[in-house]
Amino acid sequence: MDTRIFVGSNTPLGFQSFYGEKLKNIARVYILKGGPGTGKNTLLKKIGQEASERGLDTEYWYCSGDPLSLDGIYIKKLNIAIVDGTAPHVIDATLPAVKETVVALGDYIDEAKVRLYSETIIELAHQKSAHYKRAYKALASARKIMEAEEDLDEGIIYNDKLTQLAASLAYHIRRA
């Protein structure tokens, strides 16, 4: 059975990665390196699809910044993972050739074609960075508001009664 999860998240404290925990006990890790547009997501999707079609249970690790994109896959029976090793979840080989193999997709870029769009690429990279900064500020602000509301609620809301109400509602919903 295939599984779909996020192995990182965007939080009020910035990007939080759980890749280290996920990769700790995996026998073989292929780390994809390369900038935007080098085919990391496409390669991950194709390999994941092929593994699934062959009946291999596959864990799909989705990107917290773009939930339509993959940041990695884990093929359980083979105990191998293929991951995007670029920011914000930078992954580098700690045991090259023993446990990890770095795949430099950037080596296959047609640099002449990319240079034609260099101004656009630079502008979009700056915009992306600015949007992430704004998003993290918004998440931090939301956290402060939530904490302030919790402080206000303290002593007003009876948590045990709220828990009983939630349990009662869940019971009635299940019976309906």
Region roles according to the model:
Residues S17, N41-L43, S69-G72, D84-T86, ...:
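Generic local-structure boundary detector
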Residues M1-N10, N25-Y30, P36, E111-A176:
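Conserved NTP phosphate-binding and transfer environment spanning the P-loop NTPase/kinase superfamily
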Residues R28-A51:
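Glycine-rich phosphate-binding P-loop
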Residues T3-P12, Q49-I121, H126:
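Conserved nucleotide-sensing/catalytic segment adjacent to the nucleotide-binding pocket
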Residues L23, T38-K40, K76:
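Short, low-complexity cationic-aromatic patches
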Residues T11-L23:
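Pre-Walker A adenine-sensing motif
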Residues L44-G48, A81, A135-A142:
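Small-side-chain structural scaffolding
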